[in-house]
Amino acid sequence: MTKRDYQNDTTAESRPTKKSKGEKKVKETKEKKEKKVKSYVQNPSLDTLPQAEIDEFLASNSIKITDTLPDATPLRPIISFSHLPECNSNLYEQLNSFKSPTSIQSATWPLLFGGRDVIGIAETGSGKTLAFGLPCLKKIEDSKKKKSKPYQPMAVIISPTRELAMQIHDQLQKFAGPVGAKVACIFGGVRKDEQREVLKTANIVVATPGRLKDLQNDGSVDLGKVRYLVLDEADRMLDKGFEQDIKDIIQPMPVSKRQTVMFTATWPPVVRELASTFMSSPVTVTIGGDPSADPRANTRIKQVVEVVKPHEKEGRLVQLLKQHQRGAEKVLAFCLYKKEATRIERFLQSRGFKVAGIHGDLSQQERFRSLDAFKTGAATVLVATDVAARGLDIPAVKLVINVTFPLTVEDYVHRIGRTGRAGAEGHAITLFTETDKAQSGALINVLKAAGQEVPEELLKFGGTVKKKQHDAYGAFFKDVDTTKAATKIVFDD
């Protein structure tokens, strides 16, 4: 989208009598999207399913699909891998290790295979990478005859953290071979020369916003041919201040030929505004409850809250590890501050536990080593700050322990979301102290919404929810929906 197109799109309402180029482009784009949906051939085995069975599947998995195109034909969810559209390669072979698609995959795959723009709102650990990854690879397979020039990727996936970017890259690599796709992973802390080399032949670029923008600015990558764009964990990227970087990255990408996918755990006004700016007639797929309401925890996670005194936490942590950890089972222990994480890591090492740490003071190589040790079992306890609370997909985390409660209940939900992933049961234990009582009301709401037991000691702190605060304005802050038109105010003479 060029700067001029963007301006035309945002000012279209002010000039209703004359259609701008921007308006025409949006109209053309919608027509193209509708045409693409018609090109999606639904697997015949889906046609034979009774509508009642489809309705039951959507209801039982709390799937809500909202289409901005009123005349669009509803597409049936892909309930089984056997319902996937035909493929000329062995792209689907790796799926044999999975039992069935997750809810977000079932609901979004037909839409994404059909070329629609999609907003996916779902909890972490719900299988989002394959939800957007499989249609991306199918798109590359279908366009094999078109030769791409060096440094011109067909697909770009933007992620908030290097750890998540690496995770997405690794998972896509497993499926990329059969279609001959090359996947590059781009993030800061690595020499640009090495990254320029892999960008030369990459069909798919998985990147963090800052480094991708740097390489874009110095001419190392041309995004003018991107046909598939994914913004993964969009809410997290905006929280980290990447909004302008994202806009700059998207600016040279084609409008009418680009399919845009956005995945997010929450749906605040700032994310809605970004979606309305860059997406064309998107379909919104929501898994679970109202995403604009209070944060909701994964109901498969058993949440236990223990109210303790601050000086009791270290001793209780050791007791919990001895009680719940067996053999090489993985445990994530979250701390609030970097120095606290370092202290807890050393404390557990002195007690004979195999421990690794990950926090902001560590170099990139040190983080990689810690994560690798945890994944391979060389370390069975990972002590982390919130830098690791979102985006990391470490299989089979047995238990999450919150040594110190985070600053917000949203961070609490993201922390405990490291367990109970991909349909598995999870377990999270939180050590809550009087110094955390400002968060007691919000925590009680999360526990109740997930059907968890609320301890009497926690109820004694009260159920009042602390008023949301802005980083700069504190409590004097109103969460305004910027997508709504401003109210016109007329002053008398």
Swiss-Prot record:
PROSITE patterns registered for this protein in UniProt: DEAD_ATP_HELICASE, HELICASE_ATP_BIND_1, HELICASE_CTER
Motif range (Q motif): 97-105
GO cellular component assignments: nucleolus; preribosome, large subunit precursor
Catalytic activity: ATP + H2O = ADP + phosphate + H(+)
Span of domain Helicase C-terminal: 316-462
Region Disordered, residue ranges: 1-38
Domain notes: The Q motif is unique to and characteristic of the DEAD box family of RNA helicases and controls ATP binding and hydrolysis.
Function: ATP-dependent RNA helicase required for 60S ribosomal subunit synthesis. Involved in efficient pre-rRNA processing, predominantly at site A3, which is necessary for the normal formation of 25S and 5.8S rRNAs.
Full protein name: ATP-dependent RNA helicase dbp3
Lineage: Eukaryota, Fungi, Dikarya, Ascomycota, Pezizomycotina
Name of encoding gene: dbp3
